[in-house]
């Protein structure tokens, strides 16, 4: 509300002597007030459109039933060779999404000795391969796993600990550096 002709200017000595009538607010260009008939016709129009376009078969699926052939350049879930990893953290510093953290983990299942290894949150990973390219010892490599290993229902399941990353290779007690 306000009156464009008369404004109260504090400190100017000018005071409003009477309260002006409120100025009506004009609707925006192209807008019209919502009415029951207009809203109902819009809802019916959308229901008609939805019923017309209900497919008889599923258009998409959560996972393909048959795995697609992969190209040589495909970058899948990373694998970690714990015997080569020195825990330097270059992979974590290189990651553009900060998806890699360096954590202390056992050198082998059941071992009490721990070292620093990468932990990758594949929910944030771009699979760009920078961590693999920058690893000075070649401890990280790109796997070919893409559907079974990455489709999860909860985000916490997308956290790839060093134990999960080192699916094939673990350090033997005598090989530790």
Swiss-Prot record:
Q: Where does [4Fe-4S] cluster 1 bind?
A: 85, 88, 91, 135
Keyword list (alphabetical) reads: 4Fe-4S, Electron transport, Iron, Iron-sulfur, Metal-binding, Methanogenesis, Methanol utilization, Oxidoreductase, Repeat, Transport
Report the EC code(s) recorded for this entry. 1.5.98.3
Per the entry, the cofactor note is: Binds 2 [4Fe-4S] cluster.
- Temperature-related behavior of activity: Optimum temperature is 39 degrees Celsius.
What's the superkingdom here?
A: Archaea
Q: Which cofactor does it need?
A: [4Fe-4S] cluster
Keyword Heme assigned: no
Q: What reaction(s) does this enzyme catalyze?
A: methanophenazine + reduced coenzyme F420-(gamma-L-Glu)(n) = dihydromethanophenazine + oxidized coenzyme F420-(gamma-L-Glu)(n) + H(+)
Q: Where is this region: Disordered?
A: 1-21
pH and activity: Optimum pH is 8.5.
Q: Which positions in this protein are listed as binding [4Fe-4S] cluster 2?
A: 95, 125, 128, 131
GO cellular component: a single term: membrane
The GO terms describing molecular function are:
4 iron, 4 sulfur cluster binding; metal ion binding; Methanosarcina-phenazine hydrogenase activity; NADH dehydrogenase activity; reduced coenzyme F420 dehydrogenase activity
Domain named 4Fe-4S ferredoxin-type: which ranges?
A: 76-105, 116-145
Assigned protein family: Belongs to the complex I 23 kDa subunit family.
What exactly does this protein do? Component of the F(420)H(2) dehydrogenase (FPO complex) which is part of the energy-conserving F(420)H(2):heterodisulfide oxidoreductase system. The membrane-bound electron transfer system of the complex plays an important role in the metabolism of methylotrophic methanogens when the organisms grow on methanol or methylamines. Catalyzes the oxidation of methanophenazine to dihydromethanophenazine. It shuttles electrons from F(420)H(2), via FAD and iron-sulfur (Fe-S) centers, to methanophenazine (an electron carrier in the membrane).
The subunit field of the Swiss-Prot or TrEMBL record says: The FPO complex is composed of at least 13 different subunits.
Q: Which PANTHER family match?
A: FORMATE HYDROGENLYASE SUBUNIT 6-RELATED, NADH DEHYDROGENASE UBIQUINONE IRON-SULFUR PROTEIN 8, MITOCHONDRIAL
Name of this protein:
F(420)H(2) dehydrogenase subunit I
| Originating species | Methanosarcina mazei (strain ATCC BAA-159 / DSM 3647 / Goe1 / Go1 / JCM 11833 / OCM 88)
Name of the gene this protein is made from: fpoI
């Amino acid at each position: 509300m306000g009156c464009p002709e008369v404004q109260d200017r504090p400190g100017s000595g000018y005071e409003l002597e009477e309260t002006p009538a409120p100025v009506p607010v004009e609707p925006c260009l192209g807008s019209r007030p919502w009415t029951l008939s207009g809203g109902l016709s819009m809802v019916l129009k959308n229901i008609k459109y939805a019923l017309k376009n209900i497919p008889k078969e599923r258009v998409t699926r959560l996972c393909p039933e048959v795995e697609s052939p992969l190209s040589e350049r495909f970058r899948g879930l990373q694998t970690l060779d714990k015997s080569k990893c020195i825990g330097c953290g270059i992979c974590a510093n290189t990651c553009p999404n900060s998806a890699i953290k360096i954590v202390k983990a056992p050198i082998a299942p059941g071992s009490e000795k721990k070292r620093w290894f990468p932990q990758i949150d594949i929910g944030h990973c771009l699979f760009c391969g920078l961590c693999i390219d920058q690893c000075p010892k070649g401890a990280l490599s790109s796997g070919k796993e893409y559907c079974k290993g990455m489709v999860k229902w909860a985000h916490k399941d997308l956290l790839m600990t060093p134990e999960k990353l080192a699916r094939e290779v673990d350090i033997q007690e005598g090989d530790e550096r």
